[in-house]
Amino acid sequence: MSHNKMENNDCICGNNSQPIENNKCSISFIVNDYINTKNTNTAPTTNNNNNNNNSSRDFFDPLTNSNRRCYVINFLNSVCYIRNQPYNIIIHRNAIEKICDCRIFIANEISIYNSLKTKDDLFLNMINLTSFINDCVTELIFLDSFQSSLVIDIQMFSNEIGTRNVPNRKIPTPVLPPLVSDNNSTNLQNQISSQTITSQSPHINNNNTITDANLFPRKRRLNVNNYIVKETMELSKKLRTTNQTSDDYNTPKIIRKLKLRPGDCYMCPNIESNNWRNFIFNGQHITLCNACGLRMIKINKKEKEIQNSMFTTR
């Protein structure tokens, strides 16, 4: 990667770089037009109700949109294209913000997928849900890996004053395919091969580091935390109502506050959870928060039941 300073800060890739192919969408295009976080709390809409919004609304409905995987992989390929350009700190910071937006979008997309009513076609929808969750986990692993690489680049080549260094850690780096067509319905995890590399943190003086506030805006983290707290409260209410027996109303219940522990969930932007769960995905150990872990256990259980029923019918 060449790291010569660029003077033009208006574009993502720079004037000295070759243009991205026509089949790849730029980061700004995808994030601004397809990953609009202001609309992620609303229900999926159809083309009949939003004819003036082109096809951006359809991207929020993973059940009906066949182009979702193509959009996401093109976004990831466009992010990778940044590190082939001369180093520019503004472009790197913008890319980190876009990655954070993409992580929030995927988490909200998972929530929308789970909230849809799928009783009419439970067999097919459970298979689609399992494939969709596996795709999202793979995408989040790649986003976390590339975001760490951008942070290390900024540490190594920027001259700004800060207060904190990023520690060394091993980062799994999936290798994405150069192009994905709309007709490709295979699982994303079958197209991606994982490679583990060791990222070395550079030697930096105490006066030559950067702050977390510039890389991870506090406002965005607060929004993510509010989303996680809301999901946890709704889940706890459902558990209390389903586990209540006829004798429970005579005994007063003591509700204890959950002790949150810091961590990093690969499925959602959650950084605190009362229970962190470990899973193996593509031969790699990943960590999920309690809510995402429960969803993954439930999905795996139903998938096994479906496979057993298919085996017995034969």
Curated annotation (Swiss-Prot):
<dbReference type="InterPro" id="IPR013088">
    <property type="entry name" value="Znf_NHR/GATA"/>
</dbReference>
<dbReference type="GO" id="GO:0006355">
    <property type="term" value="P:regulation of DNA-templated transcription"/>
</dbReference>
<protein>
    <recommendedName>
        <fullName>GATA zinc finger domain-containing protein 19</fullName>
    </recommendedName>
</protein>
<dbReference type="GO" id="GO:0008270">
    <property type="term" value="F:zinc ion binding"/>
</dbReference>
